[in-house]
């Protein structure tokens, strides 16, 4: 790394961010970590401001201005995390062990945010005035509603390209699937378990629906393929019904995670489930079910849209060039990954966007979430080179 910034800076910054809990069970969630990032950027000479998203929940927007002659680049990273749940170690200690930094959010994705900030300061402290601006959007809420990056786009911030720093293990993603969470509520009729014929068992009806979806819809999804993101997929994530063994279940819910391709849309996704429900209703007059879009996943106005690949965009070419030179081989193009805020930036912000960041996706949300310290150091260099090449 350039002498303008040391390796210790990015490691220490990552540790500081991990030590500040910012998940949904924390009061005001990301407010404390946002304040830390704001003060850190301001202290180190970046232009910085808050975006008030909801109550005390704020995005942090930091800028390293250029000469106004080159392309502008967004570094986007989310500052919320999933809760620690039952981790294998203290989730907010941010200790370093066997070459890894440990803790909730280190990999997904406070490490990347630290790398982005450090890269901006690296360029600033080297005295390199680039042609274009570098804009950090440290956003709230990606793990649920993505209200932070939705607010960024609605605020009018734009650029010629964007990097979303989700972990990519020295590869990159040009596209990913859209995301929709659906809840299907099945209605039955309660009765005593000794006389079940007087009731309508909602769990049995749910089982019938699941079998029909597996038989009719899932094979169709496997046939839908996209060069940059793999097949269309779905998952039954939760089923819950009934009250006790001695009663016929009068209700049952099924929650579905649906990952859809650019050739699909939310309306079509819902219709495919509704068509199966309607088919069962014609066979079984006692079958009652309705589909609900889950509130915990609904954005304000936007959908969790796909990241539509733009392989010929300047940002895609720059990321490819920098990664190839850094690892001295062809970088892997990831195709089967989770949803990211890149979908919002590309679909609604109309900004060509690429996903690449330190760490490995397999450690995100994991009981042993960790990130290689060397990845943090290396990605400061990678982000620095991407910015210098793209914004020159």
Residue locations for each model-derived region?
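Acidic/His- and Gly-rich active-site-bordering loop/insert found
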Residues: 2-101, 128-130, 350, 360
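Metal-dependent amide/peptide-bond hydrolase catalytic core
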Residues: 5, 12, 49, 183-392
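Residue-level signal for inorganic ion chemistry
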Residues: 17, 21, 41, 166, ...
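Short helix-capping segments at alpha-helix termini
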Residues: 44, 126-130, 280-286
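Acidic-glycine-rich active-site phosphate/pyrophosphate-binding loop
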Residues: 83-97, 174-185, 321-322
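Short glycine/proline-enriched loop/turn "hinge" motifs that connect secondary-structure elements
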Residues: 85-86, 128, 173-179, 245-250, ...
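Phosphate-handling active-site elements
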Residues: 87, 97-99, 119-135, 213-224, ...
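Acidic/histidine-rich catalytic neighborhood of metal-dependent amide-processing enzymes
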Residues: 109-181, 391-392
